[in-house]
From Swiss-Prot:
PANTHER family: DIAMINOPIMELATE EPIMERASE (PTHR31689:SF0), DIAMINOPIMELATE EPIMERASE, CHLOROPLASTIC (PTHR31689). The lineage of its organism: Bacteria, Pseudomonadati, Pseudomonadota, Gammaproteobacteria, Vibrionales. It is found in: Cytoplasm. It comes from Vibrio atlanticus (strain LGP32) (Vibrio splendidus (strain Mel32)). Keywords: Amino-acid biosynthesis, Cytoplasm, Isomerase, Lysine biosynthesis. InterPro entries: DAP_epimerase_AS, DAP_epimerase_DapF. This is Diaminopimelate epimerase.
């Protein structure tokens, strides 16, 4: 099998992006894991696959696979790279691009300043739709592990997120708590774990341990989930700068029932071709 690909990143969250409209490729979990290996493969956090639309009201179908081969519902940084890729490769000439995902639909807008704004949809706090095991929605939940008791918010941005407010992200024990939260029994489909330091009402610092990928340089949906939780807990304003290890994202949300907007860059690194 021979195919072309692009390597891209959104604030250091890196992707292998493949056009599966003009190329016929099947990505098995084993192949994805081999390609994701940073020593013997291409190396990436996620594989992004561009497919023809499943829905006549959309322009493309957007699929995301983690480095462990699992398919996931959402990736905000990937969505920005997806938009740049389909424009760069001549698959569309639109500046506003409608895509479907495993869990819903998104609108990707290429801005004049070369940034990309993604309409991430309406944050979902209903436990059963996250999914999260709880009797009713709460602004803050208590999660217990064998040795830790954590106060967290939970939300779906098309994929599940748990958010813990910390005093300092630099000293947060992400390496220990990330895996414990990711596989916590109250999240039946596992979860992305965010650790948020509130600098002020319009700025936060964030580290994210991603489900199936580990800690990444940036997580777009994680930034969105963190801000949504922060706003519902009364900690943040409607417009927030999120400072991640890989760079900054700007998140805007007017509150319950309203769509959340994420704005940030998407960088093309190189094009390549593989035979495997």
């Amino acid at each position: 099998m021979h195919f072309h690909f692009s390597k891209m990143h959104g604030l250091g969250n890196d992707f292998m992006v493949v056009d599966c409209i003009t190329q016929n490729i099947f990505f098995s979990p084993d192949l994805i894991r081999r390609l994701a290996d940073r020593h013997t493969g291409v190396g990436f956090d996620q594989l992004l696959v561009v497919e023809a639309p499943y829905d006549p009201e959309t322009d493309f179908h957007y699929r995301i696979f983690n480095a462990d081969g699992s398919e996931v519902e959402q990736c905000g940084n990937g969505a920005r790279c997806f938009a740049r890729f389909v424009r760069m490769k001549g698959l569309t000439n639109k500046y506003s691009i409608n895509v479907s995902t495993k869990k819903g639909k998104m609108v990707l807008k290429i801005e004049d300043n070369d940034l990309i704004t993604v309409n991430m949809g309406i944050p979902e706090f209903e436990p059963g739709k996250i999914p999260f095991k709880a009797k009713q929605p709460e602004k803050t939940y208590i999660l217990r592990t064998d040795v830790h008791t954590l106060f967290c918010g939970a939300v779906s941005m098309g994929n599940p997120h748990v958010v813990t407010v910390v005093d300092d992200v630099d000293t947060a024990d992400v390496d220990t708590l990330g895996p414990l939260l990711e596989s916590h029994e109250r999240f039946p489909e596992r979860v992305n774990a965010g650790f948020m330091q509130v600098v002020n009402r319009e700025e936060v610092r964030l580290r994210v341990y991603e489900r199936g990928a580990g800690e990444t340089q940036a997580c777009g949906s994680g930034a969105c989930g963190a801000v949504a939780v922060g706003i519902t807990q009364g900690l943040l304003a409607e417009n927030v700068k999120v400072r991640l290890p890989g760079g900054d994202l700007h998140i805007s949300w007017q509150g319950p029932g309203k769509p959340l907007l994420m704005t940030g860059p998407a960088t093309h690194v190189f094009d390549g071709q593989l035979s495997c």
